């Protein structure tokens, strides 16, 4: 399954590959064949990058799930930061059930998402009003293709694990944790959107 709004990318690279193949067959020029193989590789890469595998999120009102696939790069100040490398699935999911209170897009720079100054990068901040309080999900653009795509609107009711958007080609997602939750992950952990529990309500035992 491909991510939402990825069809134009796939159509573009497939069309380009078809053009180079036709030109290579008709001309037999080595350079054109080289361009064909490069575009074929690009086609496979784009399809692989925009993959959107099915995920099953357990029903749990006392759990918060990772909003992104990747590695936990920081856990501090009631915030969990997940860095998504280029090989990770880039579709993001809501960490908790609730209603979308606001979506704010902020312009900024395009430093690598793991850089200490990436706090100034372009970002989209989604505030979700849950039964446990407000949760901020911040999608931060990286250094490559700088596009944050949102699948949701203000007023939407979300269920934990529901898709909320994606960031293209390397990025980071930060999630704030309510005070009545204990953080259940640590720096270096590999997490999966909608599947890995990153926080749980205090005195609540997560079922394995």
UniProtKB/Swiss-Prot annotation:
Domain of life: Archaea
Gene Ontology CC entries for this record: plasma membrane
Keywords: Cell membrane, Decarboxylase, Lipid biosynthesis, Lipid metabolism, Lyase, Membrane, Phospholipid biosynthesis, Phospholipid metabolism, Pyruvate, Zymogen
Localisation: Cell membrane
PTM annotation (Pyruvic acid (Ser)): residues: 171
EC number assigned by the record: 4.1.1.-
UniProt KW Lipid metabolism keyword: yes
Signal peptide stretch: none
Bilayer disposition of the protein: Peripheral membrane protein
Any one GO MF annotation of this record: phosphatidylserine decarboxylase activity
A GO biological process held by the record: phospholipid biosynthetic process
Cofactor binding: number and manner: Binds 1 pyruvoyl group covalently per subunit.
Cofactors demanded by this protein: pyruvate
Post-translational modification: Is synthesized initially as an inactive proenzyme. Formation of the active enzyme involves a self-maturation process in which the active site pyruvoyl group is generated from an internal serine residue via an autocatalytic post-translational modification. Two non-identical subunits are generated from the proenzyme in this reaction, and the pyruvate is formed at the N-terminus of the alpha chain, which is derived from the carboxyl end of the proenzyme.
Site entry (Cleavage (non-hydrolytic)), positions: 170-171
NCBIfam families: PRK05305.2-5 (NF003685)
UniProt family annotation: Belongs to the phosphatidylserine decarboxylase family. PSD-A subfamily.
Protein name as annotated: Putative archaetidylserine decarboxylase proenzyme
Species this chain originates from: Methanococcoides burtonii (strain DSM 6242 / NBRC 107633 / OCM 468 / ACE-M)
Phylogenetic lineage: Archaea, Methanobacteriati, Methanobacteriota, Stenosarchaea group, Methanomicrobia
């Amino acid at each position: 399954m491909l991510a939402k709004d990825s069809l134009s990318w796939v159509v573009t690279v497939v069309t380009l590959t078809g053009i180079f193949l036709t030109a290579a067959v008709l001309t037999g020029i080595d350079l054109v064949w080289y361009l064909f193989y490069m575009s074929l590789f690009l086609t496979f890469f784009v399809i692989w990058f925009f993959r959107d595998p099915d995920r099953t999120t357990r029903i749990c009102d006392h759990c918060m799930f990772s909003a992104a696939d990747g590695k936990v790069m920081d856990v501090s100040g009631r915030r969990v930061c997940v860095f998504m490398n280029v090989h990770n699935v880039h579709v993001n999911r809501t960490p908790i059930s609730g209603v979308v209170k606001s979506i704010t897009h902020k312009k900024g720079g395009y430093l690598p998402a793991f850089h200490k100054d990436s706090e100034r990068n372009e970002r989209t901040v989604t505030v979700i009003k849950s039964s446990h309080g407000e949760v901020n999900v911040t999608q931060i653009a990286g250094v490559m293709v700088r596009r944050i795509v949102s699948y949701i609107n203000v007023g939407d009711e979300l269920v934990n694990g529901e898709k909320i958007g994606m960031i293209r080609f390397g990025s980071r997602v930060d999630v704030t944790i309510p005070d009545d939750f204990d953080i259940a992950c640590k720096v270096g952990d590999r997490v999966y959107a909608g599947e890995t529990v990153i926080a749980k309500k205090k005195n609540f035992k997560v079922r394995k």
